[in-house]
Curated annotation (Swiss-Prot):
SUPFAM superfamilies: NAD(P)-binding Rossmann-fold domains. This is Uncharacterized short-chain type dehydrogenase/reductase y4vI. Substrate binds at S141. The keyword Ubl conjugation does not apply. Residues 271-548 are annotated as: Short-chain dehydrogenase/reductase 2. Contains two SDR domains. The keyword rRNA-binding does not apply. One of its GO terms (molecular function) is oxidoreductase activity, acting on the CH-OH group of donors, NAD or NADP as acceptor. Disulfide bonds: none annotated. InterPro entries: NAD(P)-bd_dom_sf, Sc_DH/Rdtase_CS, SDR_fam. Its EC number is 1.-.-.-.
Length: 548
């Protein structure tokens, strides 16, 4: 665990606290030194849970589908605490696994009332007690992103929760409240155990479908929630982090992992964490976001290799970080240079623990992009990235991690250039394909997708888009550009043991940019907001974010 995620004394409200994931959430936040308000249904054992935790923790019986209960909860919280720092919306009911034709209307409505309307109601009431810096994390589901038979009500409710996560993130950003979600795959909870006992779920078949070869433990979901609720996720809002072992990265018939004779031990107990210093290589690590990532791993005591086309800057940063860190000048468009680099590192270290695949921002307005320019940019940022991933994978062992740096803007149809959108989309797919391929070997992959970050590259991006700094900030719900260190924190988390079930996922570190569907929404005033956070708006302006 990263000690910097621990902010003792925060008041954390956890709904659905008495069951699987909820109990793991309670345990993790309480261990952090936070004050936990555990909320669940009557007769769920939540009162006893609160009593066992002891003062100042609290257990409360609340039915989130009843508006009167939720209003009463807010009144009690207001009386007992001066403020609420974090809400985790975890209350929910699982799928009945009944066919659509056999699903009663009341059952469909009940799923919506608890999983969606209840979560929204609790968020709205609790937000009244929140100050800038507070966070709401919704526990959604992979079912809200992928269709499956016999899950109509459950899937619809979770898809709605993911959508509300985005809209609330935009609405409350001006108040300094972040809203995010996690989307777990299959988790070893009492809910899943009951479905398995009833013969409605074949867990052995699920394991074969997951590249990592197992279902998740509740604490793996709780650790992802803890990160999203922490100060280290300060530029993440509106994002949904998929925690599925790589399920979404597989799109082919048959299994993603070979059948296993016994239940993997990691489903029941968290393996012992290797606390030895890791060997980390950061490609493009000499300046900007890459340099911030290199510094973050170095702070942890890891050995960092800074590889960059700018050898002089790489040497300078390695010198600042300390004697054990290395620098190498590498042109990743030259295959032989990349191969030689990784051969040298394998010989020196034996294996690599983390590879961070940075990129060189090359921005040309769409009107100036010839096929030759497109190819040149792809050679650097996509083909070169592929070569690095290929060689890094050869150098890794079970437990190693590959992180690719992409961009949230690549998902916008108004990308700043054809090449920019193309290579970032390619990077995301490279992450997913390698997650499916390397997951069975115990190697995880993920994409970190920054939005506008305070670097020279961000200034060039704005220039290509034809925007000044005020216009740029208006486009971002949080009302500011991010810092390179905020991207580094996301990368550090994804490479950590706390992210052990995250594989093939993309994490947007963009201040809510990708959740904002039209220009100017992000800086909409909704309550008090400081002048620093709120740039001056231009009346009737509709910014064409990325068109020159």
């Amino acid at each position: 665990m990263d000690d910097r995620q621990v902010q003792p004394g925060r008041v954390i409200v956890v709904t659905g606290a008495a069951g699987g994931i909820g109990r793991a959430l309670v345990d993790i936040f309480a261990a952090n030194g936070d004050v936990v308000v555990a909320v669940d249904l009557p007769d769920s054992g939540v009162i006893e849970l609160g009593q066992n935790l002891g003062e100042p923790h609290l257990g409360l019986e609340v039915d989130v589908s009843r508006e009167d209960d939720v209003v009463a909860l807010r009144a009690l919280l207001e009386k007992r605490f001066s403020r609420i720092e974090v809400l985790v919306n975890n209350a929910g009911i699982g799928p009945t696994m009944a066919a659509t034709a056999d699903t009663a209307l009341e059952d469909f409505q009940r799923a919506l009332a608890i999983n969606l309307v209840g979560a929204y109601s609790v968020a709205c009431e609790t937000a009244k007690l929140m100050k800038p810096g507070a966070a709401i994390v919704n526990v959604a589901s992979l079912a809200g992103l992928l269709g499956n038979p016999k899950r109509s009500a459950y899937a619809a409710s979770k898809a709605g929760l993911i959508s509300i996560t985005k809209s609330l993130a935009c609405r409350w950003a001006s108040r300094g409240i972040r809203v995010t979600a996690v989307a777990p795959g299959h988790v070893r909870t009492p809910m899943v155990a009951e479905l398995e006992r009833a013969g409605k779920l074949d867990v052995s078949a699920i394991r074969r479908r997951v590249p990592l070869g197992r279902i998740a433990r509740p604490d793996e979901i709780a650790r992802a929630v803890r990160f999203l609720a922490s100060a280290q996720a300060s530029y993440i809002t509106g994002s949904t982090l998929v925690v599925d072992g790589g399920w979404m990265s597989v799109n082919q018939p048959g299994g993603a992992h070979q059948a296993q004779d016994r239940t993997p031990g990691a489903e029941f107990m968290r393996p012992v964490e290797d606390t030895d210093a890791r060997t980390v290589i950061v490609m493009g690590g000499a300046t900007g976001v890459g340099a911030a990532i290199a510094r973050r791993f170095a702070e942890n005591g890891d050995t960092v290799v800074i590889a960059d086309g700018d050898g002089e800057e790489a040497v300078k940063l390695a010198g600042l970080l300390g004697d054990k860190h290395l620098s190498r000048r590498v042109d990743r468009t030259v295959e032989t240079e990349v191969v030689s680099l990784f051969e040298e590192l394998r010989e020196r270290f034996g294996h690599l623990d983390v590879f961070v695949n940075g990129m060189n921002e090359i921005l040309v307005p769409n009107t100036e992009e010839s096929p030759e320019v497109l190819k040149r940019i792809l050679d650097v940022n996509l083909t070169g990235a592929f070569t690095c991933v290929r060689e890094a994978a050869i150098s890794m062992r079970s437990g190693s991690v590959i992180l690719n740096l992409g961009a949230s803007l690549s998902l916008s149809p108004l990308a700043p250039s054809h090449a920019y959108g193309a290579y970032n989309a390619g990077i995301d797919m490279l992450t997913r394909c390698t997650a499916a391929e390397l997951g069975p070997l115990g190697i995880r992959t993920a994409t970190v997708a920054p939005g506008y970050i305070r670097t020279c590259a961000a200034n060039r991006l704005a220039a290509v888009a034809g925007m000044d700094s005020a216009s740029l900030r208006q486009r971002i719900p949080l009302g500011r550009v991010g810092d390179a260190e905020e991207v580094a924190e996301a990368a550090y988390f994804l490479a950590s043991f706390d992210a052990s079930y995250i594989n093939g996922s993309i994490l947007h570190v963009d201040g809510g940019l990708i959740s904002s569907r039209e220009a100017g929404w992000g800086s909409e005033v909704d309550g008090a907001i400081s002048a620093e956070m709120r740039p001056q708006r231009r009346p009737a302006a509709r910014w064409r974010l990325l068109s020159p």
